[in-house]
């Protein structure tokens, strides 16, 4: 009898494991159907959407809308934060928006003081942007990636772990504030000017995945913007906003909030906006301070570096060629690895996380290309892409969290490391980094080709 029970139990275990586990797929991405589908769709859209244009008047407007919930809410960011509910507000959270209109095209660059722009929010925006005469391709969504901000915006098991108990009112709140910020910024538009700037701040960033074995992305990318008598900046940087640990239960923007507040309080700037850049594998270099001392240190040090170049003035120009695009991104079947060679089957991932479409955002502002990706994108890979863009006489900003989420995309050479980013959060294969790099290079090449054709036609 015992032998029969043992055999039956073993059969049940084998069936269970076969239904839930699968070998890690290491098929090269170029051999899979999703790759061909992505390239085809992207090339189609690139051909159909040649909407770059320059008008005779440049208008720019800023808006800042409070996103702080009226009651205590879950905090998003750390799976091991228990409980998830905030105790109080340390500093308020906001949606910051810049609207730019060159007389032919209009765009909105948005940053929310959130962990990510949740996919549920993007679904709402797709429905409601039409009501205010906007469309999703005209919107560049980004987040500060603070790990101590509003949660409760993601249904499903993974959403609960990362962002706390789901409540539909939170995605609705975020979407409504984004829509309001776009309308306000549009109403605030005045004759404007713009400038792109870049500085290196290696002292505030480290490779948190492999330390000195890897590359860091030290570059802070900076849009300087004028709107009438007002002047603002929008900064992009790669260090994770994790100065505040999982022990913190107070709502806060972390160091991005310190950066923005310091710039407005200590310079002539009226607005200072921050967005996460390519943050995968990149952590803040905080020194030995504790919690809010750390966020204060990183935010202030970053602000002082930017203030130095602001003293000399930015090289503004009032002519702006604008192109915008949002292209579909297809990936292989998702897998959550439990070891180097074994993972949960895709159906478990889809049950726990949900199924959402993924897209890449692209803005072209003269010789600046802005790429918004639906993931924690590798700072190591970003450095390679910056250099590639410069070889084409283009500047490049890469921002994570554009309204979708595909986990982490680290450098492929770290895929088999037994660490959090590549083991638990790299869901789409051993060569996903190379795939993302190829897609971004395709977009850069298209812009470069169009620029060369335009220059030739104007000769």
Where on the chain are the PLM-derived regions?
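Conserved beta-alpha junction segments in alpha/beta enzyme cores
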Residues: 2-9, 15-142, 149-270, 275-279, ...
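Anionic-ligand-binding alpha/beta catalytic cores of soluble enzymes and soluble regulatory domains
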Residues: 302-305, 309
């Amino acid at each position: 009898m015992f032998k029969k029970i043992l055999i039956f139990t073993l059969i049940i275990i084998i069936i269970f494991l076969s239904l839930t586990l699968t070998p890690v797929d290491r098929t090269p991405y170029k051999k899979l159907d999703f790759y061909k589908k992505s390239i085809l769709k992207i090339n189609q859209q690139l051909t159909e959407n040649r909407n770059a244009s320059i008008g005779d008047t440049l208008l720019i407007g800023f808006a800042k809308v409070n996103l702080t919930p009226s009651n205590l809410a879950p905090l998003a960011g750390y799976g091991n934060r228990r409980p998830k509910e905030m105790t109080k507000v340390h500093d308020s959270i906001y949606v910051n928006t810049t609207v730019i209109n060159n007389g032919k095209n209009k765009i909105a660059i948005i940053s929310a003081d959130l962990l990510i722009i949740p996919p549920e929010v993007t679904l709402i925006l797709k429905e409601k942007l039409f009501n205010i005469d906007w469309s999703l391709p005209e919107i560049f969504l980004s987040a500060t990636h603070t790990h101590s901000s509003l949660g409760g915006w993601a249904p499903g098991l993974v959403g609960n772990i990362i962002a706390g108990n789901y409540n539909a009112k939170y995605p609705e709140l975020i979407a409504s504030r984004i829509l309001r910020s776009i309308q306000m910024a549009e109403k605030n538009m005045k004759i404007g000017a713009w400038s792109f700037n870049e500085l290196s701040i290696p002292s505030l960033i480290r490779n948190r995945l492999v330390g000195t074995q890897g590359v860091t992305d030290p570059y802070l990318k900076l849009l300087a913007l004028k709107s009438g008598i007002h002047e603002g900046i929008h900064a992009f940087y790669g260090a994770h906003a994790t100065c505040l640990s999982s022990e913190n239960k107070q709502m806060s923007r972390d160091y991005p909030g310190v950066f923005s507040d310091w710039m407005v309080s200590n310079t002539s700037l009226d607005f200072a906006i921050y967005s996460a850049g390519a943050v995968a594998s990149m952590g803040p270099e905080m020194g030995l301070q504790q919690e809010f001392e750390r966020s204060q240190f990183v935010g202030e040090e970053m602000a002082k570096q930017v203030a130095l170049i602001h003293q000399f003035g930015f090289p503004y120009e009032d002519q702006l060629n604008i192109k915008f695009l949002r292209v579909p991104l297809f990936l292989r079947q998702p897998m959550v690895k439990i070891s180097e060679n074994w993972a949960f089957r895709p159906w478990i991932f889809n049950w726990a996380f949900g199924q959402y479409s993924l897209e890449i955002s692209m803005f072209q502002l003269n010789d600046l290309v802005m790429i918004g990706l639906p993931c924690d994108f590798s700072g190591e890979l970003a450095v390679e892409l910056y250099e590639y863009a410069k070889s084409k006489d283009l500047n490049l900003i890469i921002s994570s969290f554009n309204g979708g989420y595909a986990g982490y995309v680290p450098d492929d050479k770290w895929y088999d490391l037994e660490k959090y980013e590549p083991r638990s959060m790299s869901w789409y294969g051993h060569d996903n980094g190379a795939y993302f790099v190829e897609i971004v290079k395709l977009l850069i090449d298209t812009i470069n080709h169009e620029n060369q054709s335009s220059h030739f036609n104007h000769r």
